[in-house]
Amino acid sequence: MYLRKSKKPNGRTYLTIVQGYRDAGGKNRARTVKSLGYVDALEAEFDDPVAHFEEECRRMTEEAARAQAPVTVEFSAARRIGKRSEGRVELGAAVPSAYLHRDLGIWSFFERKRTARGFSYDPCRILELLVWDRIAHPSSKFAAWEARGRFPRKCGFTADDVYRCLTYLDENAGALVSSMNASLEESRGPRDASCLYYDVTNYYFECDEEDGFRMRGVSKEHRPSPIVQMGLFLDSDGLPLGYELFPGNRNDMTTLLPAMSKAGVRDLPWGERVVVVADKGLNTSANIAACVLDGNGYIFSQSVRKATRGLKSWVLDDAGYEESASGSFKIKSRISEKAVYVAGEDGKRRRVTVPVKEVAFWSRDYFERSRRERAKVVEKSRAAVARGDLSSAAAKTPVRYAKDVPVVRGTGEAASHNWVVDEERIAADEAMGGYYCIVTSEQEMDDRDVIDAYRGLWRIEESFRVMKGDLGARPVCCSTESHIRAHFLVCYIALLAMRLMQLDTGRKYSAAQISEALAGVTGHLMDRNLYLFDYRTDLTDELAGAVGIDLSRQVLTRGQIRSIMADVKKPRS
């Protein structure tokens, strides 16, 4: 290291600390390590800035030399492993910790809370540990606490502290999510919330009893266990914006408005509006009316099978469609009216009509997929009818093309159960194969833009898969409602951190790849002060580079590990 003194055109001298090195071709190069400022400005702080920083350069050179010096470690062949000693450190945790502190501002949030409430534990540290556990190796809260020795920060809290913290996190969940959103906008600029994607899923519990929150409902996994519903919002870039939890027996269609209120997108400042994009299960009169009255927009899919006779006829009519050159896609639209019911000041519901744009399209890919799926169901239905072992309880989705008729065809004799294949329903479904319909308030939006916006729902479906799979959100190992709610807050924060990591690595890697890479950055204790690391990939380099740290070193001291963890708490440079 040496001090470079650069004379500027304004006559002032600028100081920088520079490091010399040789490039791959053997040529001498120099890189700027630190920009210091003008000498005359530094004289207000140092008597002799040049002498001071020349001494600093010598100190940094000596430190760099010591860091590159060979390390010798001796092991005894008789040495035994301590049963209670932890010989590993998961330094990959530094990457998500950087996002928690720099982008989501969790330390600042809890510091503000600290002045109003005394803590016997550090809620920020506990949350950091639980989020890392979700990302690297999802487990119970107690198991995460037991593995705290591998976390690269001191975790001097008890298991009871963790459970007390869960209650505290639940009490402050709404404020924390709002604070994270504000911090994210401060660090990365305004978020694109012009389109908000919304969907609902549920999570099962390995218990038998309902308790008012964990309730039996329509399980996505077709399990009889009690479930909890989660509604999730994503912004236009696919980043989580907010969520809400509901009892398991809550109908999906009734969750949108409470979730919008929780996310703060119902009472927006004058002139601001969002367009809510959701599937057909959310396409209800109440949701459409609320969006219109709030000054917001909507893009909802519409079931062709359950549509009115007029809408179904229009969708299936070839007239008006614009077909692609390949013949694999066709589209048309029209301005129409939709009846909705609005509660008046007297509390009575009144029927009103609102103008809507209906976009119909047909896709060969969708057609082929629906044909394959329908063929499987038809085959099961025919086989079930041939066996004659159907009951009314069995005539559901797997055999939905079997119907019970009151008389035997041909003889006219009465029969308690006479199952036949419903050929008319098969033909009707074949006619609708590949057709989709979308209803929207955005009359000026291009038809293809409407479809593209609707297709963006795959991001939220994939987010649910990540939460349930890679982040291990189910089955939930908590039992009280406050702890269950805190568990999903941790999962939500882990998902948001994961999405930011994917964004900063060009969306090239899956959540599973990132989790595996970070979990692999584990150091093994060689002696009291040295850790040996043996895992490095292009992905770990990209993740570390995104937050400005170096995870490529094979040997690190405890002090160097502490320094890395301190660096990720500092603001982004």
Give the residues covered by each predicted segment:
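Anion-binding and metal-coordination hotspots
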Residues: 2-15, 25-28, 106-573
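Conserved glycine(s) in the ABC-transporter nucleotide-binding domain "signature"
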Residues: 1-125
